[in-house]
């Protein structure tokens, strides 16, 4: 394996790990928001104080949300059975530390117990006497839950207490030393590299929940989610940009600022690497502003949209929220404008920067790809890469795996029994949802009413999936998750000629 291929493999594994972390948190964002509303509205200093309803906030953050996260983590590993036992075992960690929201503990216990349940079943089921299946299944799950609950109480809880203490001390040290803005030096570049979800949902959300439970709000929820720095970059392109970058920056600004999809501005930074300075300084400004005003959110601001910021702003602190976003955008804009005004034009264009970003992320970005496709209606197919070596294993070589499944030849498959199409992406909430919505509209216009179109995360693809549509960089993972399904690869979810090819094939099979 060449060094380049090895780096790509490592990148895929890192991206998969980051996706797994965010897949535990993102499906439960609704619960976070519900808890945030209850805390923001009904507590003593809320919008409508109510002592009775305020009592809901504590149990929700202490029990409900950690259990949901543990269930999600266990289910990702071993479906419903893994999720149930994972949630059961996580009670040990929660009860051991009732004053600390055990989100980090749940993120560890959930996948671990799900994996142990899977291995336990693999060991016991082949040795189970006929007629005793239910007995063995129930007792094996119960015994594992019993053991892991005690392990969580006696082993993981003290470990979590130590880890949370170290992390809390580090964050508090930065706060007291007025150095918290320096975190942006790492956070802003890491977002653009591919770690935005892993950072926000894997680090700041658990720590922020602990702070919010103790202090009522947390500044940590604002560090990665502030839409100001990205808006400043896009505003600079609107005024000082040229060509495709300028033309697409207006739509990108709306998607980023109001929709909260931050990845839309990543290619604009990659086009001019000096713009990393702009987003870092913008991020530092936002954090410094919120630190100076004592601002924070009661729950995660996800997605990082200005609308979400407005809805989550605590009573009496709306102006503080506006100030943090405005100053972050202003500093980012001024620095970006100076860079664009007084430096040479970049050698690479928006298309190349988008490709660079996608290569770095280890996957296609349908939102970023729309930047390129919206400026021109020509959609060119990728040229076939070189012949795959006969000695390559399709499991190790994604290109060979895609060739074996004919993922780019829509006409090569039989669609007679298809009644469900699934769009799958990393987290199952953003780009795949847009792709599914687009195909549903196409089906509706074509009179195809007997086929359901849904979206999900790759890790949550059902084993009985019939037809799965993914972006090319993710198709190999989807195939390994559902090897018996038909798989179609697209360059981006928002503009692919394969949708029309699929429609034509479905119509033919329906008429036949």
From Swiss-Prot:
The keyword Transport applies. It comes from Staphylococcus aureus (strain MSSA476). The modification Phosphocysteine is found at residue 425. Homodimer. Gene3D superfamilies: 3.40.50.2300. It is found in: Cell membrane. Residues 419-512 form the PTS EIIB type-2 domain. Keywords: Cell membrane, Kinase, Membrane, Phosphoprotein, Phosphotransferase system, Sugar transport, Transferase, Transmembrane, Transmembrane helix, Transport. It is an enzyme of class 2 (transferase). This is PTS system mannitol-specific EIICB component.
């Amino acid at each position: 394996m060449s060094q380049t291929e090895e780096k790509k493999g490592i990148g895929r594994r890192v991206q998969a790990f980051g996706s797994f972390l965010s897949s535990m948190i993102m499906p439960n964002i609704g619960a976070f928001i519900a808890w945030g509303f209850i805390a923001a509205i009904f507590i003593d200093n809320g919008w409508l104080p109510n002592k009775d309803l305020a009592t809901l906030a504590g149990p929700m953050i202490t029990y409900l949300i950690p259990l949901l996260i543990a269930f999600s983590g266990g289910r990702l590993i071993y479906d419903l059975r893994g999720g149930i036992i994972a949630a059961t075992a996580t009670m040990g960690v929660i009860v051991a530390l009732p004053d600390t929201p055990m989100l980090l503990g749940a993120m560890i216990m959930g996948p671990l117990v799900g994996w142990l349940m899977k291995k336990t079943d693999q060991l016991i089921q082949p040795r189970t006497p006929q007629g005793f299946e239910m007995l063995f299944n129930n007792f094996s799950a119960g015994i594992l839950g019993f053991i892991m609950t005690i392990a969580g109480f006696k082993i993981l809880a003290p470990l979590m207490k130590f880890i949370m203490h170290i992390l809390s001390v580090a964050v508090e040290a930065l706060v007291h030393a007025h150095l918290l803005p320096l975190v942006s030096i790492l956070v802003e570049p890491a977002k653009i590299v591919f770690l935005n979800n892993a950072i926000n949902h894997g680090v700041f959300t658990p720590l922020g929940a602990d702070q919010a439970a103790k202090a009522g709000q947390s500044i940590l929820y604002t560090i990665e989610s502030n839409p100001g720095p990205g808006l400043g970059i896009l505003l600079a392109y609107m005024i000082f940009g040229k060509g495709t970058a300028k033309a697409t920056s207006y739509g990108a600004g709306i998607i980023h600022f109001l929709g909260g999809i931050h990845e839309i501005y990543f290619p604009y930074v990659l086009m001019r690497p000096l713009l990393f300075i702009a987003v870092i300084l913008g991020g530092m400004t936002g954090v410094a502003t919120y630190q100076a005003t004592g601002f924070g959110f009661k729950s995660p601001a996800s997605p990082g949209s200005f609308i979400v910021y407005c809805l989550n702003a605590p009573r009496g602190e709306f102006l503080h929220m506006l100030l943090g976003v405005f100053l972050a955008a202003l500093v980012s804009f001024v620095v970006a404008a100076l860079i664009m005004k007084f430096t040479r034009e970049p050698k690479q264009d928006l298309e190349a920067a988008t490709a660079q970003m996608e290569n770095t992320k280890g996957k296609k970005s349908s939102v970023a790809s729309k930047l390129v496709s919206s400026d021109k209606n020509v959609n060119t197919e990728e040229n076939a890469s070189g012949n795959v070596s006969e000695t390559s294993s399709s499991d190790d070589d994604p290109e060979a795996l895609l060739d074996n499944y004919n993922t780019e030849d829509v006409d090569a498959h039989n669609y007679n029994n298809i009644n469900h199409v699934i769009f799958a992406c990393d987290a199952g909430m953003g780009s795949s949802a847009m792709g599914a919505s687009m195909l549903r509209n196409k089906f509706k216009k074509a009179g195809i009413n007997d086929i359901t179109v849904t979206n999900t995360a790759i890790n949550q693809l059902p084993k009985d999936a019939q037809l799965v549509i993914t972006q090319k960089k993710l198709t190999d993972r989807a195939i390994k998750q559902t090897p018996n399904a038909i798989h179609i690869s697209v360059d981006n979810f928002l503009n692919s000629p394969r949708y029309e090819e699929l429609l034509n094939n479905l119509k033919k099979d329906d008429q036949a």
